[in-house]
Structures are given as structure tokens and as C-alpha cells.
Amino acid sequence: LLGELVSVNARVVDIGSGAGLPGIPLGIARPDVEVVLIEPLLRRTKFLDEVVEKLELSNVTVVRGRAEEGHIQRQVGSADYVTSRAVAPLGKLAKWSAFYAAKGTILVALKGESAIEEILRDKQEVGRAGWRNESVIQLSGGEEVDDTFVVKAVHI
């Protein structure tokens, strides 16, 4: 789904990439998209570097650091989309994501069942970070897998 939401030749920053979701699958599915994976843990960045190298993903870059760190923000710069999967509560994520946003940047946060609750609870914090028009898309995981909720918002 993320591949379908992202425009042609877009730049995507994936905050707290962990094992590479959703950034690595996006890089595979969409070679036209530049993907920057931000991950603070050394062992995970080593793993991500290996995956990127083995799969020859020239459109994917791994950056070790925390999204809220100024030197990481300067190194990475702004993006058309900022994404994450189960990294932090929406309010905190909105603040971190704003560091990589320009006017029109789209936040795409993959969340669990708490997505709507987080939007209601963190609405002011999300707004202070410059995000508007929050919406939720529910994706069915089938019988064996929990549903995923995609929270979208636009930076103004």
C-alpha cells in the first residue's frame, strides 16, 4: 500500500526503521523512490546496510542516529513523505517527523488499533508540529494477522 501512496520520484524518510519496515519493501517495490532509513541502534543499522547491499538497493540509504538529533536532521534534509511503523505515540512522532517536512510533506504512520485514539488524544500536539488533515485508513490483515491502521497527515 505504501508504494501506491507515494508519488513518482519521491523522497521518503523512514523514522526508526528497525528491521527495515516499511522502508526496505518500499525501496524494492519502487526503485524510482529515494528512501532514507533512520535507525539509532548500531546492530540494526549493520543489518540494514547488509540488506541494502545484498539486494543492491541503490535507492536506499541507511543513517544511524535519532530522528530528533540536529546533525541527523541536517544530514538527511527534507522529504516528500515521512513514514514510520510502531515507533512512538503519534504526538511525539509528529514532532520528530516535522524536522524532515516541508510544506506539503505527507506523514504516513503505520499504527495498530490505537490509531484513532492517538489522533484524538494527540491532536493538539500534532497540530503544533504543523500537521493537518489527519485521516486513518484501515488495512485488513486477514484472519491470522492484526489489521494495520495508516495515519496520514499533511504538513502546512
Identify the meaning behind each predicted range.
Residues 1-9:
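Conserved alpha-helix/loop element of class I SAM-dependent methyltransferases that forms part
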Residues 9-18:
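Conserved class I S-adenosyl-L-methionine
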Residues 10, 32-156:
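S-adenosylmethionine
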Residues 19-32:
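Conserved SAM-binding loop of SAM-dependent methyltransferases across substrates and taxa
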